[in-house]
Amino acid sequence: MSIKGKELAGGNVSLSGKISSQFISGLLIPSPYTKKSVTVNIKDYIVQHSYVLLTLQLMEKFGANVEYDNNLKKIVVHPSHYTPQDIELEADASTACYFLALAALTNGKIRIDNLTYETKQPDIKMVDVLEQMGCKVTKGSSFIELEGVSQLKGGFEISMREMSDQTLTLAAIAPFADRGITIKDVEHIRHHESDRISVICESLTQLGIRVEEFKDGLKVFPGNPKPTLLNTHDDHRVAMSLALIGSKVEGIQINDPGCVSKTCPQYFRLLESLGLNISHL
């Protein structure tokens, strides 16, 4: 496919937000450079509302002229220009959650610097889930620290819509909780890099874990995963989540681990640095 750039006209567009917020952010970012204002109407709902809000706030910081309200049903971007700014980037909360979950799972302790609970990244709310499961969390002015427990607590139902990238993380540690955990409101992740609901249910079943699959989520029951070979389906979040199980069960093998390069190329080396025994075949 070849695309030849030309001046953007602007105008009105109607867009769905129920599959991914990324389509909306991708449309908004170039909109200040259109000839006339761009009006984006969301015809249903946004599954990860906070990411669009984060996009808009950064656009404003760099000089864009935008109008929106908190429900983000209508967003207007007026012709304007970005101006250079110096900013300090914080750590990626989505990636940090795998390491927080690792500490939770192994009764360990970890501190993530350059990330606070006050971040606007929605996946930071995974900290609340881990706290609900019994972990001790310290919310510092420049860090998050988590200390695990010997037995994780389950027995709850949770909507993961706003932090849906952590659905697989929670599903991977759920077998080690004392009671079942139900995850809901994440039907949209069936349309991400893989059908993530189907894939994690398939993987947990291969591990010998009882799981119930729903249209918009799943329920994971406590169990003792057995060693097996698991397929990542070329999905970085599948690989990163399933690797956590290997911290508790010897003999977990993962096909195509290189798919983590999309998010965290050094993921397995970082796990090794934290004490996990990883063999690269």
Features from the language model and the residues they span:
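Short, structured segments at the rim of ligand-binding sites
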Residues: 1-281
